[in-house]
Amino acid sequence: AIVRQLVALGYTVNGWSRSAHAVDGMAMFTGPAAFDDFLAVTDVLICVLPLTDATRGILGRRTFGGLPRGAAIVNCGRGEHLVANDLLGALDSGQLRGAVLDVFAQEPLPADDPLWRAPGVVVTPHMATMASSAVVAEQVAHNVRRLVAGEPLAHVVDMGRGY
């Protein structure tokens, strides 16, 4: 949904994934070896990754340093992706110009957290996606129909991958 909306607005969209797959309208970078190349051409990094041992802390000094100077980040994935002190340092140095943060390691974000006062940071109340009850009901009904038909369920968590 994010890709479709950005492409419709005329943006060039690049994506990075652990494994190869195609997404219409998006140039894909695949695997750990392509991560630095992906970062180098990313002006606004939108993180929607699942939380795994490999992605915990991914929004930190190394990632920020790989982005073009003056880039921005949006985190609507998981709060544990972000290393807050690294973000504050990247903002102070000008490496990043801003951040929109919708998720936090501790929610609600404590009133005295420096992210509230950091220049260039927009804090939102974990609302990047608000699924309507009708959408949720349809997803459940879809899986019930699949179960009754003896088909594999959709959106099953792979415990080996962690998502």
Annotated model-derived regions:
Residues 1-2, 12:
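Internal, well-ordered alpha-helical segments in soluble enzyme and binding-protein domains
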Residues 2, 6, 67:
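Aromatic pocket-lining residues of Rossmann-like dinucleotide-binding sites
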Residues 5, 9, 41, 143, ...:
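Short alpha-helical functional segments enriched in proximate histidine and acidic residues
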Residues 7-25:
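NAD(P)-binding Rossmann-fold cofactor-contacting core
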Residues 12, 27, 97-98, 120-122:
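Conserved beta-strand segments of alpha/beta enzyme cores
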Residues 19-114:
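Rossmann-like adenosine-cofactor binding region
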Residues 22, 107-163:
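C-terminal helix-to-coil terminal segments
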